[in-house]
Design a protein with these regions (language model features):
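Beta-sheet-dominated scaffold domains
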Residues: 65-66, 101, 140-271
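WD40 beta-propeller blade core
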Residues: 31, 76-77, 163, 207
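A broadly used, surface-exposed interaction patch
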Residues: 36-61
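Hydrophobic or amphipathic alpha-helical targeting/insertion segments
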Residues: 57-87
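Short loop/turn segments that connect beta-strands within beta-propeller blades
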Residues: 35-38, 79-82, 120, 167-170, ...
Length: 271
């Protein structure tokens, strides 16, 4: 698959969870299957398609759980498990998160902006003083590469730094604080919220952010990583961080750890 997504959904009719695993295939179509139904098959989500890097989020709107999907050269969709809706005026997003009932997103072709939807309405992207809008980042931090919801803030990762956005209520009350300036490039596909920290890879190696401070972790790993880290990707599961990247010798690897001082291990997949 090209990507995997989790649609967190509650079925009011049965009073049970109805979470769906959604898979993007190599032909850029999407299929879903039930997480909790044993033996369930994959079903195509008709007319949901992507072009380029995709992203997703879950949002409860008008009493329904929605799966939100977008891609850098595609459209923005909402899906309630039955009905798919294309939102024509939304930007093409490369990452998104939900915070304080708004969607915050990085957008294809607008490398110095973070967009946000109207309050309590993920379908409204019309720019206005009390609706949707965007925040410009024009200093030396480089491109905006990913947004992450963490500890009641939106953390905005850039090529060479991290900003913390406080965003509750009206746009006029939004505020941005620079919390980290990097001397080495940050790789967007390695940024993973993991419990009480966000872990990410830079040209210098692995680092973690606790919301206020950044520190180096697993320093010995840097000796094994190739200087070309552009294709590095990571995910998190059960409190562990899994990273796939090129090494200094042929093959790929995955690394997992629970924190920076215990339960660490490197696993070479030779793939």
């Amino acid at each position: 698959p090209m990507s995997l997504h989790l649609f967190r959904k509650f079925d009011a009719a049965t009073n049970k969870r109805d979470d769906r695993l959604i898979v993007r295939t190599t032909d850029n179509e999407y299929y879903e299957t039930s997480v909790f139904t044993v033996g369930d098959t994959f079903r195509k989500i008709v007319n949901l398609a992507a072009a380029g890097k995709d992203c997703s989020a879950c949002y409860r709107y008008n009493g329904k759980d929605l799966f939100l999907a977008s891609s850098e050269r595609g459209f923005f969709y909402t899906y309630d498990g039955t009905t798919l809706k294309k939102i024509e005026n939304a930007p093409n997003m490369t990452s998104m998160c939900v915070h304080a009932e708004r969607i915050f997103a990085t957008v294809s072709g607008e490398q110095n902006k973070v967009w946000f939807s109207a309050d309590f309405n993920p379908e409204n992207w019309k720019v206005s003083g009390d609706g949707a809008g965007y925040i410009d980042f024009d200093d030396e931090g480089g491109k905006v590469i990913k947004v992450v919801k963490f500890l009641n803030y939106v953390y905005i990762f850039r090529d060479f730094g991290v900003e913390r956005l406080t965003a509750f209520g009206a746009q006029t009350d939004f505020s941005v604080s620079k919390i980290y300036t990097a001397s080495a490039r940050i790789y967007p596909d390695t940024i993973v919220p993991l419990g009480d920290r966000i872990v990410f890879l830079t040209e210098e190696g692995l680092k973690c952010l606790d919301g206020y401070n950044v520190q180096n972790i697993f320093a010995d790993l840097s000796d094994f990583l190739s200087s070309d880290k552009r294709n590095a990707v990571a995910t998190g599961m059960d409190g562990k961080y899994f990273l796939a990247a090129n090494m200094v010798f042929p093959g790929d690897f995955a690394v997992k750890f629970l924190d920076e001082v215990r339960d660490q291990g490197v696993y070479n997949t030779n793939g």
